C-alpha cells in the first residue's frame, strides 16, 4: 500500500484536487479525488457528515487516526445543518421577532411602529446565509484537522473496505481498519399521503415555503410539528396540529409541562386536535387539500381543508444500500443497527452511532456518541448516560427537560418530591415582560438527588444544561440551591425550584 503522504503528493502532481468554495471568507475545502484503481488507506472511515459523523471524524483525526469522511450530499453537515436544526432555528427566531413587532408586544414596551411588513424572501436568505457559513465551517475544520472528505454514496463492500459512488458514476475505494456508520435518519412517510415538498411537505419543504399559507394542517404535535407549525402561525397562517396522542410535545415531556405548553401556544393562536388520527388527504383541483380526520378511537369523520399539509410523524433510520445485509448485520424491528456499549456491530471493527442506533434522535446525542465511540477505538473508556441527554423544543416559550418525568417516576415506583418556581416571580422575566412558564424539579425523596428537571419558559434550552450537569455528577437539589446564581437572571428560577424541592419552600414565591 502506498503511504498517505505519497498518495496525496502523487495526486497533487497529477492535478486531481478540486478546490471547492464553501462560502466561509474565501477558505476552500480540498476533497481527495482519485481513480478507482488507487484506493485510499485509512484508519477510520466515517460514512455520513451529520453532527455525529463530522464530529467523530474530527475527533478521530485529532487522536492521530488517518480519517476519511464520506458524504453523499454536496454540502457537509447532514440533515441538521442543511434542512433541520439550524435552518429551523433561524426561522423560529426571526418569526418570533416578527410576531412581537406585528402584534401588540412592541407597543406595550413603548416601541411604536407605523407599519410592519414581512419580506419572506429576505428571511429565507438570512436562514441560508447561516446554513452556508456553518456547513462551510465544517469543510474548514476538516481541512484544519486533515480529515479527507470524499463526496459520494458510501457502501460497505467488505469488513475493511468502503466504496463511495460519486454523482458522475465514478467510484472511490477506501481500505480502512475501522468503519463508523453515521448515516442519520430520514422522514417517516405517512401511508397513503405522497409528499411533494410543494403543498404536501415534510420538515424539509416546510423550511422553504414560497409564501405564508392561509391555512396549514400539521400531522403530529411532537417537537418538529410544534416548532415548524409555530413558525408559520407567527407569520400569519391559521395552523391546526392533529395529534394521535392526548398531549403536545412528543415522547418524554412531563405532562404538567405539556398542558401548560399547550395552553400558551393556544393563546398565541395555534390550534390542536388531540386524540385524533388522520385517515387520508386529497388534493383538489383548486390546489387545496382536504385532510380527513377522526377520533383516535374511531368515530365520526371530519374534513379540514388547508393550503399546505405538513407531515411530521417522526423519522426513521437511514440505512439504504449500506451493504449491511451482505455483511450479515441485521436491523432490529424498528430499522436500527444493533450495537454494544462500545457502539460495535456484530463485526467488531464496524461501528454505528446517532439516529441509526437506539436512543433519542437528537444531534447532540449523536455528537456525544461520535466522540466516545472514536475514543473507544483508541483504547479509551466509553461512557454515556442517556438519562442525562437533554431535550429542547425551540418554540417561544421554549420547553426543555432532562432526566425523569413525574410519569416515569410513578411508573418505576420511585418516591420523589417536587419543587416548582414560576417565571412570573422571577425578576429578569418580569423586566423582560416574558413571564409564561415555570421550572419544575424532581428530587429523590430519600436522598435529595436530582432525578429530573423540566423547564417551560424563556431561555429553557440554555438553562437545561445546568440540570444536565447536575444529573451527570449526581448533584442533590440542595447542592444547586446553595450555588450563588447571578441576579437578576432567568437562571435564578432554576435555583429557586431546587430550593423548593430541597427545603420545601422557595424564597421569592
UniProtKB/Swiss-Prot annotation:
NAD(+) binds at residues 220-227, 243, 278, 314. The modification N6-acetyllysine is found at residues 66, 104, 122, 132, 143, 346, 410, 417, 420, 505. It is found in: Mitochondrion matrix; Nucleus; Cell projection, Cilium, Flagellum; Cytoplasmic vesicle, Secretory vesicle, Acrosome. Changing residue 505 to M: Reduces dihydrolipoyl dehydrogenase activity. Does not affect interaction with PDHX. Changing residue 473 to H: Reduces interaction with PDHX. Inhibits multienzyme pyruvate dehydrogenase complex activity. Does not affect dihydrolipoyl dehydrogenase activity. Its cofactor is FAD. FAD binds at residues 71-80, 89, 154, 183-185, 355, 361-364. The active site is at 487 (proton acceptor). It is an enzyme of class 1 (oxidoreductase). Keywords: Acetylation, Cell projection, Cilium, Cytoplasmic vesicle, Disease variant, Disulfide bond, FAD, Flagellum, Flavoprotein, Mitochondrion, NAD, Nucleus, Oxidoreductase, Phosphoprotein, Redox-active center, Transit peptide. Disruption of native heterodimer state inhibits primary dihydrolipoamide dehydrogenase activity and induces serine protease activity. GO terms for biological process: 2-oxoglutarate metabolic process; branched-chain amino acid catabolic process; gastrulation; mitochondrial electron transport, NADH to ubiquinone; proteolysis; pyruvate decarboxylation to acetyl-CoA; pyruvate metabolic process; regulation of membrane potential. Lipoamide dehydrogenase is a component of the glycine cleavage system as well as an E3 component of three alpha-ketoacid dehydrogenase complexes (pyruvate-, alpha-ketoglutarate-, and branched-chain amino acid-dehydrogenase complex). The 2-oxoglutarate dehydrogenase complex is mainly active in the mitochondrion. A fraction of the 2-oxoglutarate dehydrogenase complex also localizes in the nucleus and is required for lysine succinylation of histones: associates with KAT2A on chromatin and provides succinyl-CoA to histone succinyltransferase KAT2A. It is linked to Dihydrolipoamide dehydrogenase deficiency: An autosomal recessive metabolic disorder characterized biochemically by a combined deficiency of the branched-chain alpha-keto acid dehydrogenase complex (BCKDC), pyruvate dehydrogenase complex (PDC), and alpha-ketoglutarate dehydrogenase complex (KGDC). Clinically, affected individuals have lactic acidosis and neurologic deterioration due to sensitivity of the central nervous system to defects in oxidative metabolism. This is Dihydrolipoyl dehydrogenase, mitochondrial.
Amino acid at each position: 500500500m502506498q503511504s498517505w503522504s505519497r498518495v496525496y503528493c502523487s495526486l497533487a502532481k497529477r492535478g486531481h484536487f478540486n478546490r471547492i468554495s464553501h462560502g466561509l471568507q474565501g477558505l476552500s475545502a480540498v476533497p481527495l479525488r482519485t481513480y478507482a484503481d488507487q484506493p485510499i488507506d485509512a484508519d477510520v472511515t466515517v460514512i455520513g457528515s451529520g453532527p455525529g459523523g463530522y464530529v467523530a471524524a474530527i475527533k478521530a483525526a485529532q487522536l492521530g487516526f488517518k480519517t476519511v469522511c464520506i458524504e453523499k450530499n454536496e454540502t457537509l453537515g447532514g440533515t441538521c445543518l442543511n434542512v433541520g436544526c439550524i435552518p429551523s432555528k433561524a426561522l423560529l427566531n426571526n418569526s418570533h421577532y416578527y410576531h412581537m413587532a406585528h402584534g401588540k408586544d412592541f407597543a406595550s414596551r413603548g416601541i411604536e411602529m407605523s407599519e410592519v411588513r414581512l419580506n419572506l424572501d429576505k428571511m429565507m436568505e438570512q436562514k441560508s446565509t447561516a446554513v452556508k457559513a456553518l456547513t462551510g465551517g465544517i469543510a474548514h475544520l476538516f481541512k484544519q484537522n486533515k480529515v479527507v472528505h470524499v463526496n459520494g454514496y458510501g457502501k460497505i463492500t467488505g469488513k475493511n473496505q468502503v466504496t463511495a459512488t460519486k454523482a458522475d458514476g465514478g467510484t472511490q475505494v477506501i481500505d480502512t481498519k475501522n468503519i463508523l456508520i453515521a448515516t442519520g435518519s430520514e422522514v417517516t412517510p405517512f401511508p397513503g399521503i405522497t409528499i411533494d415538498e410543494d403543498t404536501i411537505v415534510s420538515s424539509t419543504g416546510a423550511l422553504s415555503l414560497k409564501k405564508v399559507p392561509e391555512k396549514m394542517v400539521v400531522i403530529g404535535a411532537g417537537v418538529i410539528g410544534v416548532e415548524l407549525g409555530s413558525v408559520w402561525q407567527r407569520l400569519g397562517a391559521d395552523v391546526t396540529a392533529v395529534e394521535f396522542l392526548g398531549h403536545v410535545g412528543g415522547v418524554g415531556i412531563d405532562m404538567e409541562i405539556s398542558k401548560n405548553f399547550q395552553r400558551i401556544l393556544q393563546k398565541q393562536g395555534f390550534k390542536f386536535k388531540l386524540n385524533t388520527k388522520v385517515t387520508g388527504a386529497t388534493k383538489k383541483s383548486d390546489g387545496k387539500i382536504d385532510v380527513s380526520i377522526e377520533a383516535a378511537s374511531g368515530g365520526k369523520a371530519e374534513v379540514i381543508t388547508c393550503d399546505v399539509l405538513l407531515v411530521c410523524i417522526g423519522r426513521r433510520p437511514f440505512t439504504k444500500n449500506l451493504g449491511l445485509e451482505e455483511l450479515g448485520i441485521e436491523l432490529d424491528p424498528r430499522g436500527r443497527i444493533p450495537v454494544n456499549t462500545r457502539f460495535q456491530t456484530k463485526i467488531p471493527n464496524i461501528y454505528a452511532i446517532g439516529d441509526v442506533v437506539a436512543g433519542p434522535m437528537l444531534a447532540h446525542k449523536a455528537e456525544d456518541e461520535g466522540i466516545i465511540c472514536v475514543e473507544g477505538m483508541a483504547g479509551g473508556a466509553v461512557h454515556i448516560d442517556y438519562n442525562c441527554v437533554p431535550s429542547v423544543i425551540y418554540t417561544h416559550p421554549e420547553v426543555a427537560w432532562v432526566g425523569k418525568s413525574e410519569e416515569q417516576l410513578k411508573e418505576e415506583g420511585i418516591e420523589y418530591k417536587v419543587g416548582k418556581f414560576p417565571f412570573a416571580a422571577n425578576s429578569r422575566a418580569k423586566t423582560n415582560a416574558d413571564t409564561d412558564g415555570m421550572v419544575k424539579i424532581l428530587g429523590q425523596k430519600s436522598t435529595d438527588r436530582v432525578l429530573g428537571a423540566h423547564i417551560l419558559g424563556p431561555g429553557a434550552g440554555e438553562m437545561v444544561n445546568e440540570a444536565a450537569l447536575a444529573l451527570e455528577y449526581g448533584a442533590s437539589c440542595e447542592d444547586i440551591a446553595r450555588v450563588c446564581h447571578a441576579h437578576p437572571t432567568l437562571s435564578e428560577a432554576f435555583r429557586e425550584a431546587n430550593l423548593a424541592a430541597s427545603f420545601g419552600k422557595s424564597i421569592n414565591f
